[in-house]
Amino acid sequence: MPQNTLNIVILAAGKGTRMYSKMPKVLHRIGGKPMLGRVIDTAAALNPQNICVVIGHGKDQVLNAVKRDVVWVEQTEQLGTGHAVKTALPHLSAEGRTLVLYGDVPLIDVKTLKTLLEAAGNEVGLLTDVPADPTGLGRIIRDGNGSVTAIVEEKDADAAQKAVKEINTGILVLPNAKLENWLNSLSSNNAQGEYYLTDLIAKAVADGIKVHPVQVHTSYLAAGVNNKLQLAELERIFQTEQAQELLKAGVTLSDPARFDLRGRLKHGQDVVIDVNCIFEGEVEIGDNVEIGANCVIKNAKIGANSKIAPFSHLEDCEVGENNRIGPYARLRPQAKLAADVHIGNFVEIKNAAIGKGTKANHLTYIGDAEVGSKTNFGAGTIIANYDGVHKHKTVIGNEVRIGSNCVLVAPVTLGNKVTTGAGSAITRNVEDGKLALARARQTVIEGWVRPEKDKQ
């Protein structure tokens, strides 16, 4: 097997006590995706022979949440990072090298890892950092020539070693030919009673194998998450990076600090996004689209020249060109709007196709429906699509005028150019061009006297 064969081991067995959560630490999200999922994505981009994920605490939750084509290995006892990598040994190739990553270091990037792998060659690679505050972290110990000789955990460090600013990020490249022997020789004779993976550095030096340190160019790339404060800090860093990329690509963000992307955003030119908008999943926005403040848009496609007014929610839907949506509109899954459609305040659409130029400007529910072009819904129109057991379809033709406060009881079909009187409950099909009225005739009672309250 060639020496450049790459195995990747991701350590994800920890409990994460300081998260104060029933959820395993690696499932907490950055940018809408579990941290472990992000690390697996990065690992996969390196095209390794295999990816082995070591899990332990909450393993069933992890397996259910992160369904990926990797090798899952259970660490039944959490006895340290060295022990965790040892559990993965049966799944590693005899030759080549192994890159060790961490499920709670979500922002590590491909570029940094490629640099580390290139520097390590077939020897040992070590990713280091010089943070502003190294408290609690393992220190990099060098000899008089500047060569790395060991890593000392803070709990085991003396005063001189604690004064060292350069720290171990935990990310290592190790030669597989030596890995098993090194792991088998680890001792737990230390302050934490654990098998430290970091002790392999001293073993490599003792075997005459050079350790190649690479300092990460930005500290947050190798930052781990141990509590909700650190999670929030990395979330903001991640969102700031995404906002900056969009700004560089020509998107106008009214306030980059008040923008969240939890997926991917494909955009055209001259897109304007106001404050506090959240984008989730796969979102595509055409040219000259404006998104108002406080919108939530998930898995949606928005055509060119459309405007989404504030406080609108769009999910799993398609908006055609030159639409006007909102404010306070809700487009639910399988809503598909053609061009020039107007959907106004407090209008909800679900599993419905809306034809070109149709308008529903106020207080309307359209569900399980097919609507033609240039139709108008009066305020308060409701499509009653559910009979308590089954959903039923409503078909509405072109140039239909539906009066205010109408109920269309599905299944029902309204032909082209139908008009319904305000307040009607339409339960039967209406042919083209007809006027449908379905309400009680108004009665005025002459001589009626409104009763008065008894005087005390």
UniProtKB/Swiss-Prot annotation:
rRNA-binding as a keyword of this entry, yes or no, is no
Q: How is its cofactor bound, per UniProt?
A: Binds 1 Mg(2+) ion per subunit.
Task: Please tell me where UDP-N-acetyl-alpha-D-glucosamine binds in this chain.
Answer: 11-14, 25, 75, 80-81, 102-104, 138, 153, 168, 226, 332, 350, 365, 376
Write out the GO biological process terms: cell morphogenesis; cell wall organization; lipid A biosynthetic process; peptidoglycan biosynthetic process; regulation of cell shape; UDP-N-acetylglucosamine biosynthetic process
Subcellular localization, per the record?
Cytoplasm
The record's listing under Gene3D superfamilies reads:
Hexapeptide repeat proteins, Spore Coat Polysaccharide Biosynthesis Protein SpsA, Chain A
Pfam families tied to this protein:
Hexapep, NTP_transf_3
Record's Gene Ontology CC terms?
Answer: cytoplasm; membrane
Amino-acid positions noted as binding acetyl-CoA in the UniProt annotation, renumbered to this chain: A379, N385, Y386, S404, A422, R439
- What catalytic activity is recorded? alpha-D-glucosamine 1-phosphate + acetyl-CoA = N-acetyl-alpha-D-glucosamine 1-phosphate + CoA + H(+); N-acetyl-alpha-D-glucosamine 1-phosphate + UTP + H(+) = UDP-N-acetyl-alpha-D-glucosamine + diphosphate
Q: Which cofactor does it need?
A: Mg(2+)
Where are the annotated segments for Linker? 229-249
Q: Which InterPro entries match?
A: Bifunctional_GlmU (IPR005882), GlmU-like (IPR050065), GlmU_C_LbH (IPR038009), Hexapep (IPR001451), MobA-like_NTP_Trfase (IPR025877), Nucleotide-diphossugar_trans (IPR029044), Trimer_LpxA-like_sf (IPR011004)
Entry EC number(s) = 2.7.7.23, 2.3.1.157
Recorded GO molecular functions are: glucosamine-1-phosphate N-acetyltransferase activity; magnesium ion binding; UDP-N-acetylglucosamine diphosphorylase activity
* Biological source species: Neisseria meningitidis serogroup C / serotype 2a (strain ATCC 700532 / DSM 15464 / FAM18)
Renumbered residue ranges of the record's region N-acetyltransferase: 250-456
Locate the region Pyrophosphorylase: 1-228
Which of this chain's residues are annotated to bind Mg(2+)? Answer: D104, N226
Predominant localisation class? cytoplasm
Q: What is this protein called?
A: Bifunctional protein GlmU
* Function noted in UniProt: Catalyzes the last two sequential reactions in the de novo biosynthetic pathway for UDP-N-acetylglucosamine (UDP-GlcNAc). The C-terminal domain catalyzes the transfer of acetyl group from acetyl coenzyme A to glucosamine-1-phosphate (GlcN-1-P) to produce N-acetylglucosamine-1-phosphate (GlcNAc-1-P), which is converted into UDP-GlcNAc by the transfer of uridine 5-monophosphate (from uridine 5-triphosphate), a reaction catalyzed by the N-terminal domain.
Q: Main EC class of this protein?
A: transferase
Look up keyword Chaperone and say if it applies: no
| Origin superkingdom | Bacteria
